[in-house]
Amino acid sequence: MRNIYSFFFLLSLLVLSFAEKTKTIYLIRNGETDFTSDSLHRLSGRTNIPLNNLGISHSKSAGDFLSNQNIGKIYHSPVPRAKQTAEHIAKQHKTKVELVEEPLLIDASFGIYEGKTYQEAFGNEQGGEFLLHPEKLIIPEGETFYAIMNRLRLFIVKFWESDEEVCTIVSHGSIINILSLIFLQAPLEKFWSMKMIPCGVSKVHMKSIYAFEIDYWNANTFLQESKNNSNRVCQIL
């Protein structure tokens, strides 16, 4: 009987220590480019399109917003616009911040559609299908959203198993949308439900590789010039 009590006591300690372990993730979408400012909106993907002047300004503003926070290392996508954004954020911080290029955070490959508008890529019928059923999207020479979700899970596990307590991610719209689904354990059908504007900032508490708590999502009131300055928290529909 004593052994049974000892077992449950040790088990309770293990559960308690597991519950108390919490890490923090900051998410920042890369700054505006001429592709995202285009009213027709072009699929950027892995195309090397630099930040425009507003994108640079907003990246610095995001850096100011985070300047007093312990943001740890900044893990950024290899795509240049994400690296640019990360560099501007790091320069605004009060302590030296290490930048780490992370291939798992690279933007989606939109294959033959990269650089095209949604209309050019999908047309009316397929474009509507993309909005209603993003989980069914198949792009010639591109990457499926399921493949993206799998590689993002690998990054999440790698962070959880590391000694780091804080992780800051600078990546892209499609990547952050899918990360939000992982955080909320939502299906790919909800891909459009948790969007962030360029240089929007989100903060998430990670309690295990399966348990997350969103502190705030898409904070952007510091982007005074933004056309979409709504500081909203989107809800899963």
Region locations from a protein language model:
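Sec-dependent signal peptide recognition
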Residues: 2-10
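Bacterial Sec-dependent signal peptides at the C-terminal "C-region" and cleavage site
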Residues: 12-22
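Acidic, low-complexity terminal tails and accessory targeting/binding regions
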Residues: 20-23, 95, 108-119, 181-237
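Residue-level preference for the first positions of well-ordered beta-strands
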Residues: 25, 164-170
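Phosphate-coordination/substrate-recognition cap region in phosphate-metabolizing enzymes
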Residues: 61-128, 194-196, 202
